[in-house]
Swiss-Prot record:
Disulfide bonds: none annotated. The lineage of its organism: Eukaryota, Metazoa, Chordata, Craniata, Vertebrata. Belongs to the cytochrome b family. Component of the ubiquinol-cytochrome c reductase complex (complex III or cytochrome b-c1 complex) that is part of the mitochondrial respiratory chain. The b-c1 complex mediates electron transfer from ubiquinol to cytochrome c. Contributes to the generation of a proton gradient across the mitochondrial membrane that is then used for ATP synthesis. Binds 2 heme b groups non-covalently. It is found in: Mitochondrion inner membrane. It is a multi-pass membrane protein. This is Cytochrome b. The keyword Transmembrane applies.
Length: 380
């Protein structure tokens, strides 16, 4: 009998064990689609980014015009840029939904997979931040100035660190060139980390909506979930293409149509929508170092999720109190996102402070208390 190449070839068998014969729980829902959607986003971003890099010039005097040139004179340059800019938004939508799924269904108990995932989120945030600086518009320049300046809050070494990061005494040409280098490099780091993420995931297998072991009821990934992933791809690509073609600048800042000017500060400096929740937490603390620590904690708190799990059940499927708390957390993040886009004045300051407090309180205090209460109510 001839050997099956798919199962025996050194390279093909790796792909086979990851995408074809992978034993998968039979009951995973559409919430398990976001992993593959993130893979699709990453591939799209790397391809469009590579095409943009071919026409981009990382120099303060040429960056803005090189981007304008790409949009005006390069064949489909406008489309490539719009796909790349809006692809970032869809990347973050998918990763936030993916993390939300992980919290709801207790997927964070696969500790290695979860920790690599949080590192992936941090790398993605770094990539998006340095990428936003590259067009060298007003918001690019001032966003870079404000965010890099946060490092100066670190005691003793802060100022030196910031000047080392800038490559001078302000955000200037050296900053732009190194940010371009980072923006080119980091997506490949993300791709490498993704493989590690999947390697750890395939050690334990996927979790499922019931949060119970599913070894007794596994089905092959292909054709069942490969076709389901294709449906997910179509459902994401439709709004993505629609956004990129009909209103490509909807999520951008109009300030970025003005070339960077170190002598004129925009009236409201704010990051892209996907960073607004963290920006609101940063602004809600009147002390610089405190704000920076809260900003870091807002994302790093995810590392604590496995340690804060006290429930005897893995998933929230049969835990109505935890579910209510989870959806309050989601609403709270939406409020923080909205507050982050508003100016720093009376109602927004206090709303931001309350929402920031609620965010940390739910994750650090209320989730464990409510989980313990549910254990008691169910006599577990």
């Amino acid at each position: 009998m001839a050997l099956n190449l798919r199962k025996n070839h050194p390279l093909l068998k790796i792909i086979n064990n990851s995408l074809v014969d992978l034993p998968t729980p039979s009951n995973i829902s559409a919430w398990w689609n976001f992993g593959s959607l993130l893979g699709l986003c990453l591939i799209t971003q790397i391809i469009t980014g590579l095409l943009l890099a071919m026409h981009y010039t990382a120099d303060t005097s040429l960056a803005f015009t090189s981007v304008a040139h790409t949009c005006r004179n390069v064949q489909f340059g406008w489309l490539i840029r719009n796909l790349h800019a809006n692809g970032a938004s869809f990347f973050f939508i998918c990763i936030y939904l993916h993390i939300g799924r992980g919290i709801y269904y207790g997927s964070y108990l696969n500790k290695e997979t979860w920790n690599i995932g949080v590192i992936l989120l941090l790398t993605l945030m770094a990539t998006a931040f340095v990428g936003y600086v590259l067009p060298w518009g007003q918001m690019s320049f001032w966003g870079a100035t404000v965010i890099t300046n946060l490092f100066s809050a670190i005691p003793y070494i802060g100022q030196t660190l910031v000047e080392w990061l800038w490559g001078g005494f302000s955000v200037d040409n050296p900053t732009l060139t190194r940010f371009f280098a980072f923006h080119f490099l980091l997506p490949f780091v993300i791709a490498g980390l993704t493989l590690v993420h999947l390697t750890f995931l395939h050690e334990t297998g996927s979790n499922n909506p019931l949060g119970i072991p599913s070894d007794c009821d596994k089905i092959p990934f292909h054709p069942y979930y490969s076709i389901k992933d294709l449906l997910g791809f179509a459902l994401m690509l439709i709004p993505f293409i629609a956004l990129a073609l009909f209103s490509p600048n909807l999520l951008g800042d109009p300030e970025n149509f003005t070339p960077a000017n170190p002598l004129a500060t925009p009236p409201h400096i704010k990051p892209e929508w996907y960073f607004l929740f963290a920006y609101a937490i940063l602004r809600s603390i009147p002390n610089k170092l405190g704000g920076v620590l809260a900003l870091a904690a807002s994302v790093l708190i995810l590392f604590l999720m496995p340690l804060l799990h006290v429930s005897k059940q893995r998933s929230m499927t049969f835990r109505p109190l935890s579910q209510i708390l989870f959806w309050i957390l989601v609403a709270d993040l939406l409020i923080l996102t909205w507050v982050g886009s508003q100016p720093v004045e009376h109602p927004f300051i206090i709303i931001g402070q309350l929402a920031s407090f609620t965010y940390f309180a739910i994750i650090l205090i209320l989730f464990p208390i409510v989980s313990a209460l549910e254990n008691k109510m169910l006599k577990l």
